[in-house]
């Protein structure tokens, strides 16, 4: 009888929820709206959801590829290399919103007069040629304390792709590494002279500050909503939910919620651009 009922639901287009939990892993950036959506779906639909951020975007892609989770979260597109590495996984990306990677500094750097950097200046810092903020227009001498995002995380890949054209072209560097967004913001806020890459929505303007990027025309472009939506800001990036094939069962319930009005409101609540802001 249960099998017949399940078949009827399936034929009617109603997602059939598995008794096993829906496991989700990946980006700490995408996690914010997803974790809140999961709370709502647990309460309203009794959906058993487990959300983790182990390994960031790279972890979400690899665990989905290995079949350890049913849903991955990623702040970078799935690459051809990822697809070749996991040939049994039919990566299906669902675009849920837009974000940007910002170069953030500690309060003392901001107060030292650093408000914008060019690509050439950032490359000089990353490659170790410039080590003091005064060389970049700071009012007083101050050592640059750079924290590098862990290679493989979506934030790092977007950053080095912009800086070098490809993650593979990025040089090996010897900076302290940071993982998730909370860790990055805490490290930068508590370290004099600090600089790192971070999701723009996490730059609170109190403890850490997002720098503008100086374009080829010499004009600074800040990671503000209109610049991210128009891609005038060069480090704009899409946010994805990933499934193996078309979303089904609990994964479809989650995806449908995130693409609906309530889910898109959560995307916006956490500082990201909802889809309607990209296609008004």
Predicted regions and their residues:
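Exported/periplasmic ABC-transporter solute-binding proteins
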Residues: 18-87, 91-280
